[in-house]
Amino acid sequence: MPISSSFSIRRNAKLWQISTASLTFTVFGRFPELGRVYASATGEHKVAVVDMETFKTIAKTGPVKYPDGIAYAPGAKRVFVSDEHGNADAVIDTTTNSLVATIPLDGGAGNTVYDPGSGHIFVAVHEKNELVTIDPSTAKIVGHYPIPGIESPHGMAFDVSARLAFVAGEENNKLAVVDLANMKVLATYPVGKDPDVLAFDTGLEQLCVSAESRNVTVFRENGKTLVTVGSFSIPHAHTVSVDSDTHLVYFPLQNIEGHPLLRIMEPSRMK
């Protein structure tokens, strides 16, 4: 999905525009502590680094066969990038913006997420139906955890305070709740076909699961289980982001009547 603009979540105002004539950005990782955005430039098989003040591309690093999920480990000062088609996770040193390691996963890399509770990077591995944990400082795999009931895990979100992970399976359209204390699956729930991106509102304890099939399923956390709030359909709504302060939910839509659109919704309307 070509991205041409960004928005201030606080003011819902258009702030800047980046020409993407030669780049297609599919995933952004925005890290204010670095003053940079790391974006997957899939057409070039690289990760682009954009300065948040000047909005200029200051570096490109790779090769990464198909860069997808992006996460930042602050202690190690490293960015980890899912290489979905390369069956690996790529590691970028943010002090030099250079590729310093490639971690083989023996399967397609789904989402990559940093867990501040454990200090580890989590990667969903498609063909292995498991979560892999990585020590950011050594860039070594430190754990393999099967996710029974989930086929081809891809999207992930965490409730860090409750020590829960939510993992969606692309092949069987299920969502798992995983207890991070023991890495056991507590329950699974049906979601829309081809689930992609997950977003968790820490204030409302509410989870959105967006799917390639246009379906969005909304859950409310209830202890260590989930209660379905509702579901609805939005064209191209396979990407979602939430602001836990305002509770607004953002859906960047690729093509609505011939042009990209950012749809912003209040949680009370997502039923």
List the predicted regions and their residue ranges.
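Predominantly soluble domains enriched in secretory-pathway, periplasmic, or organellar proteins
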Residues: 1-271
